[in-house]
């Protein structure tokens, strides 16, 4: 029956049975993996998704989404609509002053945001916290930008005292500052307003700094939380220059993708006309996945602000509840305020494998995304507590 189902799906272009069997095995493996996934910030609640008929088309958003191109099979209009949705979420009150695009991932957005900063300030040094995503120093290496990792607080935020000390040491040299809204391992939020206040106090005005926000996960969480402090809200009126987020994380697309929004003045600085495309070169990739654009568009407008707000509020509450449950075993557990990430000592290898936990430096975490079920949290809590009691008795 499964082979017949696959044959009906592929129709006249049916694949050999050997290949169909391999696809079915892959489908089964993925289904099982999704059911026990707890370690990475992927929202697996995709919803209805896109019509299968759209898979028949090569949809390529070439060049600048605001300029279009010679290629007619694009969805640039829907890309602009999706970006405008995000712009409003992040406080872009005059949309004409901002630019955005959808790319391969939040990492692509961070690389491009840092590139915009380098073009604005060619002699700048890139500053980031020790808890920043690995793609931030990678962006520096790719672009041959000098970078400096600053110490973090124990809960994973950028230490503002370390930032102030570094600015004194730099003696006025321009800086590109990468801040994080939801750090990779601990789900911490850098104090955006506090960091900008430190910059201002050191006489680093907008002409001597560029600030990028890596909001891969929580730039789609914090704006929806009514009790989140204004200082960690990724709103452009705080004074930063660009922000990126992932589509396959809180937004919930079935493929990796992401979005970048930046002040238009920075993009205008690097824009080049490309006659071959009848467009402008303003993006890192020349070809951008139109199917990813459609997936983000469907999620943003189909799910809507209200449901995203509910998802964020409920997920934060459930993460805090999970942390309390794990602490009942006597384990040390960190769950930052307004975070979906629950951090604990790395458990037994079988628990790591079963729940696909992300581990680093002796720590591991679970991330309570909207797609995580209560049953999965119950199973994980039981396994974690049994293992912790065993380790405690053995010690």
Residue ranges and their predicted role:
Residues 103-107, 123-124, 128-131, 137-194:
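PLP-dependent aminotransferase-class I/II
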Residues 27, 137, 272-284, 304-395:
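Conserved C-terminal alpha-helix-loop-beta "cap" of PLP-dependent enzymes
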Residues 76-79, 83, 97-122, 139:
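Conserved beta-loop-alpha segment that forms the PLP phosphate-binding cup at the N-terminus of a helix
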Residues 1-96, 362-364:
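N-terminal entrance/gating region of PLP-dependent enzymes' catalytic architecture
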Residues 112-115, 137-142, 187-191, 221-226, ...:
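Short acidic, glycine/serine/threonine-rich loops at helix termini
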Residues 189-227:
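Catalytic PLP-binding core of fold-type I/II PLP enzymes
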Residues 183, 216, 224-338:
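Active-site C-terminal subdomain of aminotransferase-like
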């Amino acid at each position: 029956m499964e082979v017949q189902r696959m044959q009906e799906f592929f129709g006249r272009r049916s694949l050999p049975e050997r290949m169909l069997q391999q696809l079915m095995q892959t489908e089964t493996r993925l289904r099982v993996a999704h059911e026990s996934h707890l370690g990475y910030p992927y929202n697996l609640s995709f919803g209805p998704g896109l019509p299968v008929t759209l898979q028949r088309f090569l949809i390529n958003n070439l060049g600048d989404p605001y300029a279009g191109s010679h290629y007619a099979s694009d969805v640039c209009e829907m890309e602009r609509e999706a970006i405008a949705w995000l712009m409003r979420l992040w406080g872009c009150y005059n949309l004409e002053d901002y630019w955005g695009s959808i790319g391969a991932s939040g990492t692509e957005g961070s690389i491009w945001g840092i590139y915009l900063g380098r073009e604005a300030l060619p002699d700048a040094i890139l500053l980031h916290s020790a808890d920043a995503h690995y793609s931030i120093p990678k962006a520096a290496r790719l672009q041959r930008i000098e970078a400096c990792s600053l110490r973090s607080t124990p809960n994973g935020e950028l230490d503002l005292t370390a930032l102030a000390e570094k600015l004194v040491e730099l003696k006025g040299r321009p800086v590109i500052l990468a801040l994080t809204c939801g750090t990779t391992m601990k789900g911490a939020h850098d104090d955006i307003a506090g960091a900008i206040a430190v910059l201002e106090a050191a006489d680093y005005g907008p002409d001597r700094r560029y600030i990028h926000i890596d909001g891969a996960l929580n730039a789609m969480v914090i704006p929806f939380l009514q009790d989140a402090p204004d200082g960690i809200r990724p709103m452009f009126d705080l004074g930063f220059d660009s922000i990126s987020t992932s589509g396959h994380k809180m937004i919930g697309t079935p493929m990796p993708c992401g979005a970048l929004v930046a002040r238009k003045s920075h993009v205008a600085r690097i824009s080049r006309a490309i006659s071959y495309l009848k467009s402008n070169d303003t993006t890192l990739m020349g070809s951008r996945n139109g199917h990813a654009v459609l997936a983000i568009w469907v999620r943003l407008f189909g799910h809507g602000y209200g449901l995203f707000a509910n998802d964020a509020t409920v997920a934060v509450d459930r993460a805090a509840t999970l942390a309390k449950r794990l602490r009942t075993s006597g384990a040390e557990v960190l769950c930052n305020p307004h975070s979906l990430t629950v951090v604990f000592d790395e458990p037994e290898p079988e628990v790591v494998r079963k729940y696909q936990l992300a581990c680093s430096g002796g720590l591991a975490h679970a991330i309570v995304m909207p797609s995580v079920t209560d049953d999965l949290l119950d199973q994980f809590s039981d396994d974690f507590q049994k293992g912790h009691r065993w380790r405690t008795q053995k010690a």
